[in-house]
Structures are given as structure tokens and as C-alpha cells.
UniProtKB/Swiss-Prot annotation:
Pathway: Lipid metabolism; mitochondrial fatty acid beta-oxidation; Amino-acid degradation; L-isoleucine degradation. Its EC number is 1.3.8.5. Substrate binds at residues 161, 208, 262, 270-273. Gene3D superfamilies: Acyl-CoA dehydrogenase/oxidase, N-terminal domain, Butyryl-CoA Dehydrogenase, subunit A, domain 2, Butyryl-CoA Dehydrogenase, subunit A, domain 3. It is an enzyme of class 1 (oxidoreductase). The gene is acadsb. GO terms for molecular function: acyl-CoA dehydrogenase activity; flavin adenine dinucleotide binding; short-chain 2-methyl fatty acyl-CoA dehydrogenase activity. This is Probable short/branched chain specific acyl-CoA dehydrogenase. Homotetramer. FAD binds at residues 152-161, 186-188, 298, 309, 366-370, 395-397. PROSITE patterns: ACYL_COA_DH_1. It comes from Dictyostelium discoideum (Social amoeba).
Amino acid sequence: MIKKLILDPKNVSIIKNGIRNYSKSKSFIQPITTLSEEETLLKETVANFANEKVRPLVKVMDETSELNKGLLKDLFDMNLMGIDISDSYGGANMNFMGSIIAIEELAKVDPAISVIVDVQNTLVNNCINRYGSIQQREKYLSMLATNTVGSFCLSESGSGSDAFALATRAVRQSDGTFVLNGTKQWITNAKEAGVFIVMANVDPSQGYKGITAFIVESNNPGLRIGKKEDKLGIRASSTCEVILDNCVVKPTDILGELGRGYKIAIEGLNEGRIGIAAQMLGLAQGVFDSTIPYLMERKQFGKPIATFQGMQFTYADLAVDIEAGRLLTYNAARIKEAGLPFVFQASMAKLHCSRVAEKAASACISMLGGVGFTKEFPAEKFFRDSKVGQIYEGTSNIQLQTIAKEIVKNFNK
């Protein structure tokens, strides 16, 4: 059948013209990793920023577990905290792919700074941009794009992978306000945040349909920051308890609608998983790029160790894994941008890239030998930073479960 179609005289000219036009335009089918001029400029700009502004601060921020305040201001000045927020609100007015590119480039130097930008753009900004009222968008997107860190409060001590087994309650009062009580745990950006998206259960009898998202500002007297975690990695990014103690919010602080918190959180996390994939991809590329030059320079038995077959097999295998991760991540981002279902691709990208990040960091330490085990080389920090990729925004087992569900769903169509 296909042969007949190709040999049909009517189709031969169409095929020939198509090939001729393709050879002229060179743009018949663009590779997944092709970037627009604007995206390429962003990539170069963020790479330069990361090397010039972030790299000199990485060691101190890691040792002290503190984000440099001047660097945070620089992130806002560079518009990296509002990448796909409209310029009418002070944002960079780019696309979702722009956020992914920035996250990847920052992670090549410091995954901790990368995740700060990731949570801001793929979770907080996106949720308010999509579900916020006109008044909420005008107020909060302007703040988030220019000077205010955002935080996404879902997890609790008793709700990790079962993220919606929430104990935090929101009780409606006679005057229409809601009183929030509960403790959120492992909340990224909590120490620096001025705006929090808080998930609370208004009606536990309704299950996940009782969950509602509220916007709470840091100056609310009922909200305070609790214990800051002393973490293995991504130490410049704060991870804290957020304690809600008779925290009063107005009906106008509801994000979306009453009972829509589950949908808002799920959609936000699905997009956030592409962001984490980009972070882990950048980490893998960063540790790889910092290791190869040493292998070229270091000599044993009169030869650069990069020429030894055992070494070659190791770093060639890593290069394949990293490039596959880039294809998965960029493809998921492009599908999301096109408005198509992307959950399957997002989970695959996060699963693969988080695995590759740990694999790459571990392998690079082994290839570096003794120096890789010291803090003189960045590989040990990349190794510590890599582990969280398999934990937050859905563990690797949750990603496998999601992928399996999507396979079954598509098979049964």
C-alpha cells in the first residue's frame, strides 16, 4: 500500500517538491533540542550569569546553608523569577520552555539556586497565573516577578507520597473568613518567601474534593516559619516547616474555587516535574563538564586517563544518558507548551533525569579518584545535591506508578 502511494504519479511530484523545499528551508522538521533565537539568547545569558554571579558563591552558600541575599536580588533583576509572567506585570514574557532552559543552566553551576527559580516559575507563578482572579494576578504576579519569593505548601509529616492526606484544616467562620490550622513540612523557599500557596482541607468528608488552595502572605500573624532543615544537599535553598496557627484568610484569598485545590496542586506538580527534570539534567551536565577536563589532563602510565578504554566506556555511557534526558525533558516541555496532555512525558523525564543525575555524579567521583572525594572538586557537592531528585515532587516510585497508569489508560482507549 505504501509503495503504491509513493509510486503514484500524483504523489511523486508532491514528494519531490517536499524534499526540494526541505533542502532549501532546512526547517521541514526541527530537532526537539532546537531553540528559538530568543531561547538561545536566554540560554547564553543565564549561563554567563551562573558562571559570573553564582559560581563564586556556591561554596560559601553550601557550607553555611544560607542563600546570598545579593544573589537573590540579582535573580529578580535578571527577570529569572518571573520568566513566563507577562511583561505587563513586570515579567520576562517568555514561554514555559524559557523556564526550563534557565533551570537547566543554573543547575549546571548550583542545583540549589536552580530549584529556587524552578519552584517560583513552574509551581507558584503558573498556579496563580492560571487560577488566580484578575485582582490576584494583578497583585501577586507583579510581586513575584519583581521582588517577592513564592512558596508552595502541600506536604505534611503525615502526607508525603500520599500528598492529599492533609491534616491542615480550613474552617469557615460566620463572617465568611477561614481559619487555617496545621503544619506544612519540607517547604522549599519558605524562609525567603513573601507569598505562600497553602493547601488545606475545608471539608474532610469530601476527600480530595474538600481541599482548597489559599494565598497567604508572610505578614499574616497566623503564619510563621518553623524548623529549618539541615540537609544533605541543595543547602542554599531553604526547606522549612510552615506553621499555621489560627491563620485567618479572606474568601478573596482562595485560589481558584472552593474545593479545587486538588486539581490546582496536581496540575502544578505535573509541570513542576518537568522543572525538576531540567534541574537534574543540568546537574548531570554540570558534573560531567567539570570532570572531563581533568580526565584529559591527568596522566597515568604516560597517557591521559581519558584515553583508557575503561574511562571511555564510562563517560560515553554518561553522555548517552544525559542526551536522552535532554530529549525527554525538552519534549515534555514542548508538549506542555502545545497544550497537549503531558503527564506521561513529564514523569518519564523526571524519572530518567533524576536517575542520571545520581549516576553521573557518582561515576564522576569514581573517575576523578581521590580528588573527587574532596571538596576541592565540585563532584562531591553535585553528588549530595543529586539524591533529592528521586524524592521531591513525586518519588521515583510514584513516577513509575504514574507512567504505568498512563500506559494502561492509553491501552484501554
